[in-house]
């Protein structure tokens, strides 16, 4: 068993490549995806994701978070919906502070 290991089993995996989703497992060790497929072994944490979808973080290219980022720098509502990256200032106005 690896320390800091997480196995997500039986997930409906959408890998972001455009291929069909498939049922499989994802092994994460020390916060890094190490393997995707049918994985056996003992792991620190095992999550049975049967009936659930597992996908990479989504990118939201059109947001109006500019002012919100001044008080919520993590864009918390997006994280709660699977969005890990946002683009701001794409409406020709950005209220977010800009630093060198």
Where are these regions (language model features)?
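Di-metal (Zn2+ and/or Mg2+/Mn2+) metal-binding site signature of metallo-dependent hydrolases
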Residues: 53-77
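Divalent-metal coordination cores built from histidine and acidic residues
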Residues: 71-100
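Flexible loop/turn segments at secondary-structure boundaries
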Residues: 15, 66, 93-97
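N-terminal metal-binding scaffold of metallo-dependent hydrolase/deaminase domains
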Residues: 1-42
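Activation segment
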Residues: 17, 37, 67-69, 87
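Active-site metal-binding motif and surrounding structural segment of the metallo-beta-lactamase
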Residues: 40-57
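Hydrophobic/aromatic beta-strand patches that form the interior of the parallel beta-sheet core
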Residues: 8, 45-47, 87
């Amino acid at each position: 068993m690896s320390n800091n290991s997480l196995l997500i089993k039986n997930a409906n995996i959408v890998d972001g490549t455009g291929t069909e989703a498939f049922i499989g497992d994802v092994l994460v060790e020390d916060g890094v995806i190490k393997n995707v497929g049918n994985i056996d072994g003992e792991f620190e944490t095992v999550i049975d994701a049967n009936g659930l979808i597992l996908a990479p973080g989504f990118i939201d290219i059109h947001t109006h978070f500019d002012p919100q980022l001044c008080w919520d720098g993590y864009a918390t509502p997006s994280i709660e919906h699977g969005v890990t990256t946002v683009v701001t200032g794409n409406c020709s106005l950005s209220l977010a502070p800009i630093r060198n």
